[in-house]
Amino acid sequence: MTTRTPLMAGNWKMNLNHLEAIAHVQKLAFALADKDYDAVEVAVLAPFTDLRSVQTLVDGDKLKIKYGAQDISAHDGGAYTGEISGPMLAKLKCTYVAVGHSERRQYHAETDEIVNAKVKAAYKHGLTPILCVGEELDVREAGNHVEHTLAQVEGGLKDLAAEQAESVVIAYEPVWAIGTGKVCGADDAQEVCAAIRGKLAELYSQELADKVRIQYGGSVKSGNVAEIMAKPDIDGALVGGASLDSDEFVKIVRFRDQ
C-alpha cells in the first residue's frame, strides 16, 4: 500500500494580520527546528493579505513549512471585484488552496459546481486543492452523512483527470463539529474517510485512492489528534482555531510523540 505522508494544515481563517503572521510562522519554525519533522508535512493557510509576508519569510529562511490560500477564484482575471486568481497565488508560490470550505458554502452559497470550477482553476495554475466536504447536523442525525459527503466529493472532482485527482487532498469536516467544541468521534470520522477512499476507487482506481491524503477537520486539538490519526484512512488534519496557538499546533503536528 502507498505510504501517505500526513498533512497537518492550519486554517487561520480571518485571523492574524501580516505582522502577526510573520511572528506566528517564526514561532512554528523555531519550535519544529529541534527535530526532523519530514515525517509530517506542515502547512498554513493564511489570509490573502498575509501571503506575501509568509512567502518572504519561508523563502528567506528556507523554512520547510508550506503555505497556501483559503480560497481561489474560478476565473483567471478580469472584472471580478474582490476575487483572487490562481495566477496571483501561483506567483506567490503557494502550494495549497482550500476549496469548498463549509464557511464558503454557507456564507457565499458555493455549490458543488462552483467548487468544481475552483478545483480545476487550482490545478490549471499548479496549486494543490484541499477539497473540503462534510455534512450539517441534520444530515448526520438523519443518517445520510456518508451519502451527502460522497456526493460533494463526486461533485468537486467532476471531469477531473486521474493525473490531477491523485494529488488532491480531501478534508472531511463535519460542519457541526467546526468551531463548536463538538468532536466527531474517531470511529465516525474513519467511517466517512474510508467511504471517501472507496468513492475515489470507484471514480478512478484503487491505486489512485491509496495515494490520496484524506484529512479530518473539526475541533482538532492536541488532546484528540493521536486517536484520530491512528485510524487507517485519516492522513492528517485541517486545524482551525487550534492552529492560531503555535504551541498547540506544534503538539498537533507531533501527534506521534503523545
From Swiss-Prot:
<keyword id="KW-0312">Gluconeogenesis</keyword>
<feature type="binding site">
    <location>
        <position position="219"/>
    </location>
    <ligand>
        <name>substrate</name>
    </ligand>
</feature>
<comment type="similarity">
    <text>Belongs to the triosephosphate isomerase family.</text>
</comment>
<keyword id="KW-0324">Glycolysis</keyword>
<dbReference type="InterPro" id="IPR022896">
    <property type="entry name" value="TrioseP_Isoase_bac/euk"/>
</dbReference>
<dbReference type="InterPro" id="IPR000652">
    <property type="entry name" value="Triosephosphate_isomerase"/>
</dbReference>
<dbReference type="InterPro" id="IPR035990">
    <property type="entry name" value="TIM_sf"/>
</dbReference>
<dbReference type="InterPro" id="IPR013785">
    <property type="entry name" value="Aldolase_TIM"/>
</dbReference>
<comment type="subunit">
    <text>Homodimer.</text>
</comment>
<dbReference type="GO" id="GO:0006096">
    <property type="term" value="P:glycolytic process"/>
</dbReference>
<feature type="active site" description="Proton acceptor">
    <location>
        <position position="173"/>
    </location>
</feature>
<dbReference type="Pfam" id="PF00121">
    <property type="entry name" value="TIM"/>
</dbReference>
<dbReference type="GO" id="GO:0004807">
    <property type="term" value="F:triose-phosphate isomerase activity"/>
</dbReference>
<feature type="binding site">
    <location>
        <begin position="11"/>
        <end position="13"/>
    </location>
    <ligand>
        <name>substrate</name>
    </ligand>
</feature>
<feature type="binding site">
    <location>
        <begin position="240"/>
        <end position="241"/>
    </location>
    <ligand>
        <name>substrate</name>
    </ligand>
</feature>
<feature type="active site" description="Electrophile">
    <location>
        <position position="101"/>
    </location>
</feature>
<protein>
    <recommendedName>
        <fullName>Triosephosphate isomerase</fullName>
        <ecNumber>5.3.1.1</ecNumber>
    </recommendedName>
</protein>
<comment type="pathway">
    <text>Carbohydrate degradation; glycolysis; D-glyceraldehyde 3-phosphate from glycerone phosphate: step 1/1.</text>
</comment>
<dbReference type="GO" id="GO:0019563">
    <property type="term" value="P:glycerol catabolic process"/>
</dbReference>
<feature type="binding site">
    <location>
        <position position="179"/>
    </location>
    <ligand>
        <name>substrate</name>
    </ligand>
</feature>
<dbReference type="GO" id="GO:0006094">
    <property type="term" value="P:gluconeogenesis"/>
</dbReference>
<comment type="pathway">
    <text>Carbohydrate biosynthesis; gluconeogenesis.</text>
</comment>
<comment type="function">
    <text>Involved in the gluconeogenesis. Catalyzes stereospecifically the conversion of dihydroxyacetone phosphate (DHAP) to D-glyceraldehyde-3-phosphate (G3P).</text>
</comment>
<dbReference type="GO" id="GO:0046166">
    <property type="term" value="P:glyceraldehyde-3-phosphate biosynthetic process"/>
</dbReference>
<keyword id="KW-0413">Isomerase</keyword>
<dbReference type="GO" id="GO:0005829">
    <property type="term" value="C:cytosol"/>
</dbReference>
<keyword id="KW-0963">Cytoplasm</keyword>
<dbReference type="InterPro" id="IPR020861">
    <property type="entry name" value="Triosephosphate_isomerase_AS"/>
</dbReference>
